[in-house]
Amino acid sequence: MIQKEKIESLFDKWTMKLRLIPDWDITLQWIEDPSWNKTGDIKIDCTDKKAIVLLNAVSPKQENLEEVLVHELMHLKLYPLDQVTEALIQSNFEEGSNGYKLAYHGFFETLEQTVEELTKCFLLEFGENKNLSFGRCGTQKTFTELYDGLNNLE
């Protein structure tokens, strides 16, 4: 059972800890739709400096919602870098080209890894629940399965 009051208290703590407040107006929204397949997400309006953190109240895939909360807030913290890099990719590559696809995929994968690493660092230092979620990892192929069927290079 999700303890919404506890998560809302952690939301207040983390918006201050990450120095997002008072620069940004940020709210937390619980998603009650069982068909929503994410654990968390964020909507950002840079013009008005407003953001909405969305958390799955029905069927979250991650065990530690504090980790998810910090992860989504890190996306807001890094959003200026996200926007500049995306603009550079769009201005230097033709949309749909191989270079565009490579740059876009590489950037967003690296951004996601960076957000997650920063989340882990802050969570392990300042989090109330320092246990990392392994929900998505459990659905991935094993190392052996990834290489099963590849030809021997010798």
Predicted regions and their residues:
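Active-site recognition of the HExxH zinc-binding catalytic motif
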Residues: E67-P80
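Metalloprotease/metallohydrolase-associated module, dominated by Zn2+-dependent proteases
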Residues: I2-E63, P80-E154
